[in-house]
Amino acid sequence: MMLAREPKYLSKYLSTLVPRLAIRHRGLWIILLLAFTNNLASTELIEFRKGEHQLFAEVALTASQRSRGLMWRMEMADNMGMLFILEPQSRQCFWMRNTYLPLTIAFLNQDFKIMQLNDMTPLSEELHCSEEPAHFALEVNQGWFAQRDIQVGDHLEATLR
């Protein structure tokens, strides 16, 4: 999965996002701090929880990580995904070029509230755009949210792992 349009003002956005997240999401604050110092490893994970359900997401923060996304992967564990940190001032679009896994994308606001869910077909260049500006996009195996009765309007809890 690839971000079809890269954020142009990511550092400006992150500088305003960090103070807000420091108050609400201590784990994500640490991830953003590491990103500013270029120490973010591709293996850093955020744990998302909704009730008893748990998901671990790799963080795609650099331009390279965002453009590669989940491309070329042939499998992904059921409780894994990828989190994209977005520029929230505009709608964001994703496609499935060179992505072999059927995915569901969740567009999230700054509080990790699910604003929109879209199922995406492997290897398709159809754009899947957020209906409203989103702060994050979370890609998971297709059906992960539906199988757990997690819906638009639900909030996810996030913690650095």
Per-region residue spans from a language model:
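N-terminal secretory signal peptides that target proteins for export/translocation
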Residues: 1-23
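Generic detector of intrinsically disordered, low-complexity, polar/charged segments
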Residues: 15, 23-24, 66, 78
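Short N-terminal alpha-helical targeting/association segments
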Residues: 16, 30-31, 131
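Bacterial N-terminal signal peptides
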Residues: 24-37
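Compact, glycine-rich, soluble single-domain proteins
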Residues: 42-161
